[in-house]
Amino acid sequence: MSEQLLSELSPVAATSPSPAPAAQQKLNLLDMNRQQLREFFSSMGEKPFRADQVMKWIYHYCCDDFDQMTDINKHLRARLKALAEIRAPEVAEEQRSADGTIKWAIKVGDQQVETVYIPEDDRATLCVSSQVGCALQCTFCSTAQQGFNRNLRVSEIIGQVWRAAKIIGAAKVTGQRPITNVVMMGMGEPLLNLTNVVPAMEIMLDDFGFGLSKRRVTLSTSGVVPALEKLGDMIDVALAISLHAPNDTIRDEIVPINRKYNIETFLSAVRCYLDKSNANKGRVTVEYVMLDHINDGTEHAHQLAACLKYTPCKINLIPWNPFPGAPYGRSSNSRVDRFAKVLMGYEFTTIVRKTRGDDIDAACGQLAGEVIDRTKRTLRKRMNGESIEVKAV
């Protein structure tokens, strides 16, 4: 990571908004949380409760047509159609994994981001992107290799949830579980887009929005400390941290933002967030990708235990998911098991995460959103004699 880029990772940069829409465009109601929607209706001379009615139609019923909102009078519907729209990003491509995971390439302007639906026995998690690309340049992550383009707008973030809910809702007959959890773990660093991420999460939590529990909405960060310090005063959601190293020497190399905000500075900010939060039950989720002979030795496990001694947490060990041109290998099962046993010996709750969707490059660290990656993936599949279901939408 360049010094210039590091200098830009400041509270100002972390909260800078994405470009506003052109003046002639209708207002997209997906860009507004409930308070903003009420202010919009008040500006029209309408009662604030109209905002609640419309919001319920949008998010409870995935409705994007004002004419279908039958408890809104025709005159108001006509005014809404003249002034506003409900426009979620469209799906460009859908891929389905053998394990039930679905990855959507979502069109945002002339670019794409990726959204992943992960069904399990007792839940269904949606992994949502916050930026086109990523500025943090983590060396083990496919998204980082395409660089950073722009922040997503509120409508482009919550629109991923809306679009997925609409698709899954229409497919109930196939037995797919409705979305129960949302994780801000897709493309981008959420804390570098607070201006848009926070209102989107507010809609996820709002009873007139998706009505999710604050413990079921998780924000993951690599350590933009000034923005993390602000987050605790803005919203209370579950927190996960992308640590990935037991010491600053290794983390400086694989997570370059560590050169600006080192591990102790990061963990100190995490503890402050936990002190303010009810959503985390007093502990943070630590994400740790296992890189063969880089950070996966038993000596690293002992160092990690010492590093986290004063930070209440549970630890997710993540098998590294390969992408073309990456300089790493995935840790063997035996090395992961030995690593986990050391941590459990220190009485850390330790989970070895099951890889989901890696056959469609939807697993952790594999999201890229670019056609060039799909070309390389297809070649790799053919060389292995495998097939993949791809559907253009």
UniProtKB/Swiss-Prot annotation:
Principal cellular location given in the protein's record: cytoplasm
Top-rank taxon, per record: Bacteria
Catalytic activity line of the entry: adenosine(2503) in 23S rRNA + 2 reduced [2Fe-2S]-[ferredoxin] + 2 S-adenosyl-L-methionine = 2-methyladenosine(2503) in 23S rRNA + 5'-deoxyadenosine + L-methionine + 2 oxidized [2Fe-2S]-[ferredoxin] + S-adenosyl-L-homocysteine; adenosine(37) in tRNA + 2 reduced [2Fe-2S]-[ferredoxin] + 2 S-adenosyl-L-methionine = 2-methyladenosine(37) in tRNA + 5'-deoxyadenosine + L-methionine + 2 oxidized [2Fe-2S]-[ferredoxin] + S-adenosyl-L-homocysteine
Binding site for [4Fe-4S] cluster: 134, 138, 141
S-S bridge residues: 127-364
One annotated Gene Ontology cellular component of this protein: cytoplasm
Protein purpose: Specifically methylates position 2 of adenine 2503 in 23S rRNA and position 2 of adenine 37 in tRNAs. m2A2503 modification seems to play a crucial role in the proofreading step occurring at the peptidyl transferase center and thus would serve to optimize ribosomal fidelity.
EC number: 2.1.1.192
Chain positions recorded as S-adenosyl-L-methionine binding sites: 188-189, 220, 242-244, 321
Keyword annotations of the record: 4Fe-4S, Cytoplasm, Disulfide bond, Iron, Iron-sulfur, Metal-binding, Methyltransferase, rRNA processing, S-adenosyl-L-methionine, Transferase, tRNA processing
InterPro entries in the cross-refs: Aldolase_TIM, Methyltransferase_A, RlmN_N, RNA_MTrfase_RlmN, rRNA_lsu_MTrfase_RlmN/Cfr, rSAM
Listed cofactors: [4Fe-4S] cluster
Region described as Disordered: spans on this chain: 1-22
GO molecular function, one term: rRNA (adenine(2503)-C2-)-methyltransferase activity
Protein name per Swiss-Prot or TrEMBL: Dual-specificity RNA methyltransferase RlmN
Keyword Transcription listed: no
Enzyme class: transferase
